[in-house]
Design a protein with these regions (language model features):
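Catalytic cores of secreted or luminal carbohydrate-active enzymes
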Residues: 1-56, 78
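Short beta-strand-plus-loop segments that form exposed binding edges in beta-rich domains
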Residues: 11-12, 129-136
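Extracellular carbohydrate recognition and processing domains
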Residues: 91-121
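A short beta-strand element within beta-rich, extracytoplasmic domains
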Residues: 63-76, 126-132
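Exposed low-complexity, polar/acidic, P/S/T/G-rich flexible segments that act as propeptides
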Residues: 32, 133-151
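Residue-level signal for short segments within beta-strands and strand-turn junctions
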Residues: 29-31, 83-87, 147-149
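Beta-strand-rich binding/interaction modules
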Residues: 68-90
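Short beta-strands within extracellular/lumenal beta-sheet-rich domains
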Residues: 39-66, 78-80, 108-116, 137-143
Length: 151
């Protein structure tokens, strides 16, 4: 609902109910799409405490009219976004020095690309790669990637 995920839960037993049985319903709220996250291994991990890493999306077909990439993330300033074709071949206009960088935010971090929007890739199947880099005590977390139409 809006910027929240609401989870209603209650007490339930798979048994006969006696006179002393009672039930309660509770509500847990989380920021939108924050049920799980992708991040880097913890810094203290034996060999896996890497300072950087990345994650690839499944192939997606971009809307013909173009769209924007928006991240739901913690510490989005420690991330950058690249676009490849469905075969993992990075696209020159959307990778390396042309990577998109998320603007400050949290639930809706718009990604600014030097090459502009993704209208040139409309109707094509692509993958999105999100790079993450740890910076001191700041640990980036990616919760969701959205493709938003400007219309």
């Amino acid at each position: 609902m809006g910027d929240e995920t609401r989870i209603y839960h209650g007490r339930w037993r798979n048994a006969e109910y006696g006179e002393e049985y009672y039930a309660e319903v509770a509500l847990a709220t989380l920021p939108r799409d924050r049920w799980g996250a992708l991040g880097l291994y913890p810094e203290g991990s034996t060999q896996l405490g890497k300072l950087e890493g990345w994650v690839w999306s499944a192939p997606v077909t971009l809307p013909a009219e173009g769209c924007r990439v928006v991240l739901n993330a913690e510490h989005p300033e420690l991330m950058r976004v690249e676009i490849s074709d469905a075969g993992f071949n990075l696209l020159p206009g959307y990778s390396d020095s042309n990577s998109g960088t998320p603007q400050k935010g949290s639930l809706d971090c718009a990604v600014a690309c030097p090459s502009g929007d993704l209208a040139a890739l409309g109707g094509k199947q692509v993958r999105i790669r999100v790079h993450m880099q740890r910076d001191g005590a700041s640990d980036p977390r990616l919760f969701a990637i959205y493709l938003r139409s400007d219309s």
